[in-house]
Amino acid sequence: RSVCRQIKICRRRGGCYYKCTNRPY
């Protein structure tokens, strides 16, 4: 199984992208 969570990260410049993270939160 994949314990990966997809989070959306937005930068100040106005660029948003999705990143795969394994953070506890």
From Swiss-Prot:
It is found in: Secreted. Disulfide bonds join 4-20, 10-16. Its main location: secreted. GO terms for cellular component: extracellular region. Keywords: Antibiotic, Antimicrobial, Disulfide bond, Fungicide, Secreted. GO terms for biological process: defense response to bacterium; defense response to fungus; killing of cells of another organism. Active against both bacteria (Gram-positive and Gram-negative) and filamentous fungi. Acts on the membrane of the bacterial cells. It destabilize a membrane by modifying its properties. This is Androctonin. It comes from Androctonus australis.
